[in-house]
UniProtKB/Swiss-Prot annotation:
It is found in: Cytoplasm. Keywords: Cytoplasm, DNA-binding, Iron, Metal-binding, Repressor, Transcription, Transcription regulation, Zinc. Fe cation binds at residues 92, 94, 113, 130. This is Ferric uptake regulation protein. Zn(2+) binds at residues 38, 86, 95, 106. The gene is fur. GO terms for biological process: negative regulation of DNA-templated transcription; regulation of secondary metabolite biosynthetic process. Homodimer. The keyword DNA-binding applies. Belongs to the Fur family.
Length: 141
């Protein structure tokens, strides 16, 4: 899915919130800005040490926690695997998780969104937030 939005400047947002932007944090922010996948902390760590081998895994975990607390990223705990992360910005989308490869595919369906709204309203509710994760196996060709 092409993301039809401009990625926010998290560095500026964090500075405004009084967070010091260290070199390791800047590297991690750049990784998150450039990624098109949903990496886990270990994958972010692997990418970060390619730029600076002094970055520790605990620095990655602390930074991810900080970014999550500030609303800059979303943590996804897809079944059967470690928490994975994505930026909190952009248009709403849902996820298909390939149960064999672990790949995550983003998608949006107006039909699904409309149906969810209709169901919630018919039961006397208004959707405030939701997450849809479809766990799938690829069709055999």
């Amino acid at each position: 899915m092409n993301k039809p939005y401009t990625k926010p400047d998290y560095e500026q947002e964090l500075r405004r919130a009084g967070v010091r932007i260290t070199r390791p944090r800047r590297i991690i922010l750049n990784i998150l800005n450039e990624t098109e996948d949903h990496p886990d902390a270990l994958e972010i760590f692997r990418r970060a040490v390619e730029e600076d081998d002094s970055i520790s895994l605990s620095t990655v975990y602390r930074t991810m926690k900080l970014l999550e607390e500030r609303g800059a990223i979303h943590r996804h705990a897809f079944a059967g695997g470690p928490s994975r992360f994505e930026q909190a910005s952009g248009a709403h989308h849902d996820h298909i998780i390939d149960m064999d490869s672990g790949d995550v595919v983003e998608f949006h369906s107006d039909k699904i969104e409309k149906l969810q709204e209709e169901i919630a309203r018919s039961l006397g509710f208004e959707i405030v937030h939701h997450r849809l994760e479809l766990y799938c196996k690829k069709l055999k060709s």
